[in-house]
Design a protein with these regions (language model features):
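Flexible, low-complexity linker and terminal segments
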Residues: 1-8, 18, 130-340, 345-348, ...
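Thiamine diphosphate
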Residues: 1-133, 161, 225, 287, 372-510, 516-523, ...
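Short acidic, glycine/serine/threonine-rich loops at helix termini
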Residues: 34-37, 60, 81-85, 107-114, ...
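Short helix-loop-beta junction
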Residues: 37-43, 243-253, 472-478
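A glycine-rich helix N-cap at a beta->alpha junction
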Residues: 43-50, 91-102, 180-188, 430-443, ...
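Conserved thiamine diphosphate
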Residues: 104-153, 159, 186, 190, ...
Length: 597
């Protein structure tokens, strides 16, 4: 049976068909749906981990215990998991183990576009790259077999277009792979004397065998066409782009097993074509190795090294051809930057925080990163998961040295706090920093699509779980001053910020209100209520001062002709932030509907 599937769905299906029993992940675009789809298969135990390192380590534990396992994460998550990965690369596996890295060329939803293929080379492990959904499923099965055959974790490298594009997939049946009975092995105790032996084995055996396999496997295949004037080496979605523009005018060496590279096959292919192109997104990973082998090729000297590729780009840079462009007046196209949703509980907090002109606001990765956009213009920085608190701590130390009156405020969400914020908070406690650290608790992992976390009370399969209380954790870490506020009540927020900045030691402020898009649980309804309202503007009272507009709510719009503000009732949820900032009290409830949830 064939089914139209995204790459993420196909990876999940491949995990099921290959006999995987354990899967762990931390959500992050474009990888999130991999574990969400895996969780639909009862034969695979699946879990959201607090962060990528924990996901990797849990999958390692499952492998050591004898089961096939995987960990999935976006590209920057591999940085977090790298500590575990680079040592597990030495020890090898018992049950097959695959790490899925979902890279994001073009930065669709990421702070960088790092090329994680280099992790395979750094770790000296096998790497596989599918070019469509069928291969995503099939290659997952192959990856598990390669992992066990060569005693190596396997890096499955996919990109946004592979993850989210759909192609037809031929479905197969599940193969039940027995759990290997556990036996204690010295290789899993990598003290220096053991690791020396393991490293030697990698160089003298694993990589030698993987190179031989790379040259022999059908995962790396040649397609001869025409007069062989043009040869193309490519992998992943870039292969599809190359095929689209060159069709049968070129011959192809399609790389599916991309580390170690099949250098003998590449040399043979290159010797039989007149002009050799290496087409790959982002870094010249393949090109560098090919040129290092003394093979002449055309790559990044013509093909862009930044952002995504597409057929139009390749056609222009390689063939000198351009598709017709539809001309339009871009001045009439509205500028629509990303913004916090109407009713977002973060809006009121940042509106009040930004009023403190002496505040240095160190934000983090999540919806609240949008607080740096106009009109809020609140945050000063955002770096990586957990950095909000750490940067605030370091900055405050320097402000104090300089005799500045600047006050650092660290900001992160609830899921980020569980991810890597706890150690950052502990740093500010241990090293006596007078910072205000804020946790925006919207009761869910928001930006990636409402995944559960240790604070929500549910697992990925909807089973009840222990709720970890952020306030109690903060106290346990040594914070003496902890306060919880409703972020929709601006007077409370204003007073709480002032309170938090008054101490000469760390203080924690928790804003607690569910994401406006979240379907409320019974527990949420008991705590926050079960309602939805609509606000409206009284045109007789509105003076067009646009104080409400400065909150950045997309439900509000200003009419230049009438010089009045109106509210889109399809978006409004009556969070009342706009009503509270209106100096003329021109905004009030329109109707109350008992439909929330």
């Amino acid at each position: 049976m064939r089914r139209l599937m995204t790459g993420n769905e196909a990876l999940a299906r491949g995990a099921w068909e290959s006999g995987v029993r354990f899967a762990s992940a931390y959500p992050g675009t474009p990888s999130t749906e991999i574990l969400e789809n895996i969780s639909e298969y009862e034969e695979i135990y699946s879990e959201w981990a607090p962060n990528e390192k924990v996901a990797m380590e849990a999958a390692v534990g499952a492998s050591i215990a004898g089961a096939r396992s995987l960990a999935a994460m976006k590209h920057v998550g591999v940085n977090v998991a790298a500590d575990a990965l680079l040592t597990f690369a030495y020890t090898g596996v018992t049950g097959g183990m695959v790490l899925i890295s979902a890279d994001d060329p073009g930065l669709h939803s990421s702070q960088n576009e790092q090329d994680n293929r280099y992790y395979a080379k750094l770790a000296k492990i096998a790497m596989i790259e599918p070019s469509d959904s069928q291969e995503a499923k099939d290659y997952m099965i192959a990856a598990m077999e390669i992992s066990e055959k060569f005693d190596t974790p396997v890096l499955m490298r996919v990109t946004t277009r592979i993850c989210h594009s759909k192609t037809l997939v031929e479905l197969g049946e599940r193969r039940e792979v027995p759990i290997v009975p556990y036996e204690k092995q010295m290789k899993y105790n990598p003290i220096p004397s053991v690791s020396k032996v393991l490293h030697k084995n990698i160089e003298e055996n694993r990589l030698v065998n993987l190179r031989r396999f790379s040259n022999e496997t059908s995962l790396n295949s040649i397609e001869w066409n025409g007069d062989r004037k043009i040869g193309i080496i490519s992998a992943g979605v870039a292969y599809q782009y190359a095929k689209e523009i060159f069709e049968d005018r070129a011959s192809y060496l399609k790389i599916g097993f991309s580390y170690p590279m099949p250098m003998e096959k590449i040399k043979d292919f290159a010797s039989q074509v007149e002009t050799l192109y290496v087409i790959e997104e982002l870094e010249p990973f393949m090109e560098e190795q090919i040129k290092a082998a003394g093979i002449s090729c055309i790559g990044k000297d013509k093909i862009p090294q930044i952002y995504e590729l597409n057929p139009d780009i390749l056609k222009k840079v390689l063939l000198g051809e351009e598709n017709p462009v539809i001309e339009y007046d871009d001045s009439v196209v509205a500028n629509r930057p990303p913004t916090l949703c109407a009713g977002c509980p973060h809006r009121g907090f940042f509106y009040e925080l930004a009023k403190n002109k002496n505040a240095f606001i160190s934000s983090d990765i999540g919806c609240y990163a949008l607080s740096g956009m106009a009109p809020l213009n609140a945050k000063d920085t955002a770096l990586c998961m957990g950095a909000g608190f750490s940067i605030a701590h370091g900055a405050q130390k320097v402000f104090n040295m300089a005799g500045s009156n600047k006050r650092a405020v660290g900001v992160m969400g609830d899921s980020t706090f569980f991810h890597s914020g706890m150690t950052s908070l502990l740093d500010s406690v241990y090293n006596k920093s007078n910072v205000l650290q804020v946790i925006l608790d919207n009761r869910i992992t928001g930006m990636t699509g409402h995944q559960e976390n240790p604070g929500t009370g549910y697992t990925i399969k909807g089973e009840a779980a222990t709720v970890t209380d952020i306030g109690e954790v903060s106290k346990a870490l040594g914070v003496k001053h902890v306060r919880v506020v409703n972020p929709l009540k601006l007077s409370e927020v204003k007073e709480a910020i002032k309170w938090g900045m008054s101490f000469d030691e760390p203080a924690v402020l928790i804003t607690r209100w569910p994401c406006v898009l979240k379907k409320l649980s019974l527990e949420d309804k008991e705590e926050f209520g079960d309602y939805m309202s609509k606000n409206a503007v009284d045109p007789d009272k509105c003076i067009g001062c646009r104080a409400c507009i400065r909150t950045g709510c997309p439900a509000l719009s200003y009419n230049k002709d009438t010089k009045k503000v109106t509210i889109d009732r399809n978006q409004c949820v009556a969070c009342d932030v706009c009503a509270q900032v209106c100096p003329k009290k021109a905004i009030d409830r329109e109707v109350v509907l008992n439909v929330r949830g």
